[in-house]
Regions:
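Nucleotide-activated sugar donor-binding and catalytic core shared by glycosyltransferases
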Residues: 1-378
Length: 378
């Protein structure tokens, strides 16, 4: 069978690569063609575009690159029609993928499977109409999405477990590098580590990293280690950390979290990864026009939280400094509460255990692959 996959960011590349491996187990003759990244390419198949050509966020960035986005979308539509896959698999990235779903539904008879649901429970809930009309099967990775889709909107979905939890479990089972070995390999001293996870897109990194570094530097008895995002070159980071005391690791985020004492994390999948490694964290997300964004967030968002940790727990487990609450001083204040072995740190770690329990121990890649192959072969 032939599978056409589309992702738009680094986390999607990771999750899709695991799904592709699982699809190959269920369908050894599977062929892949995709918009994706290096991890998907390592599994095999034909990459027609790198996700970096799609990964624009924010109104200004999208407008500046609108011609590129529209050109890629037109190419994607033509490519699907010409290749004639047995299924189109969309992974998150709804701004692009829902338009592709509409096209495929209206112009072909190819089934559309959505892996990692658009977060319409947070905003743009009206998109449920598009999903119902254009998506044949939706595979969810967040437990609270089940009542949202099935009870509120009467749209049956598959909850398959969480791929991040699966990936963390697999890594921890195989990883055996000691703290001493990790420090020696990366030229670190014996001080405890503050991990900096500043996002996977250049706009995010530029908006968050400088103040994250400034806040963390207030704690001289700790050393700062930055997890570089895949696809972002060293020269880009040098503009923010060149010649400073910030160490950089590349392609070793999970190894860093295995040895970190605490972390500053840009909102996204990384907040859940950090929690699953049981590293206390402060969630940070800077925006342009923070006061306006803070007001619009209160006005438009339908959820109380932005981090997956708090959304899954349905309460505040980790502090969120977003838009108008994001500042060097606020980051430092929240970080200070977590560094000693005090009550705030212990309460956060207890909250992490609650998140683990709610996610469960299913293997989402395998469950999703089995369902997809079964439906395609009908």
């Amino acid at each position: 069978m032939k599978y056409y996959l589309i992702v738009g960011e680094a986390s999607g590349d990771l999750h899709a690569s695991h799904l592709m491996k699982a699809l190959l187990k269920e369908d050894p003759k599977a062929e892949f063609r995709f918009f994706g990244g290096d991890m998907m390419s390592a599994v095999g198949g034909t990459r027609v575009r790198h996700y970096r050509e799609l990964a624009y966020m924010g109104i200004i960035a999208v407008l500046l690159h609108l011609r590129t986005i529209l050109r890629n979308m037109a190419f994607c539509k033509r490519d699907i029609v010409e290749w004639r896959p047995d299924a189109v698999i969309l992974v998150d990235y709804p701004g692009f993928n829902l338009k592709i779903a509409k096209f495929v539904h209206e112009h072909t008879k190819i089934p559309v499977y959505y892996y990692i649901s658009p977060k319409i429970w947070a905003w743009k809930e009206y998109r449920i109409k598009e999903i119902k009309r254009n998506v044949d099967e939706l595979f969810s990775i967040l437990p609270f999405e089940v009542p949202f889709f099935e009870q509120k909107h009467h749209y049956p979905i598959h909850y398959v477990g969480n791929p991040t939890a699966e990936e963390v479990r697999q890594f921890r089972a195989a990883y055996n590098v000691s703290g001493e070995e990790f420090r020696h390999e990366h030229g670190l001293d014996e001080r405890p580590i503050i991990a900096l996870l500043a996002g996977s897109r250049k706009q995010e990194i530029a908006g968050n990293l400088p103040q994250m570094i400034a806040a963390a530097r207030r704690f001289g008895s700790y050393q700062l280690v930055l997890a570089a995002a895949p696809g972002i070159d060293a020269e880009f980071y040098d503009a923010f950390i060149g010649g400073s005391d910030v160490h950089v690791v590349r392609g070793e985020t999970y190894a860093l979290l295995s040895h970190a004492d605490t972390a500053l994390v840009t909102s996204g999948t990384a907040t859940l990864e950090t929690a699953l490694f049981r590293v206390p964290q402060v969630v940070c997300y800077n925006t342009a026009l923070p006061k306006l964004v803070g007001f619009l967030r209160r006005l438009m968002l339908k959820v109380k939280y932005v981090s997956l940790v708090n959304l899954i727990a349905d309460r505040e487990v980790v502090p969120e400094l977003v838009a108008n609450t994001f500042s060097e001083a606020n980051i430092a204040e929240q970080l200070k509460r977590l560094l000693p072995d005090g009550a705030a740190r212990r309460e956060m770690l207890e909250g992490y255990e609650e998140v683990w329990r709610k996610i469960g121990e299913d293997s989402p890649s395998e469950r999703t692959a089995k369902e997809m192959v079964l439906k395609v072969k009908k």
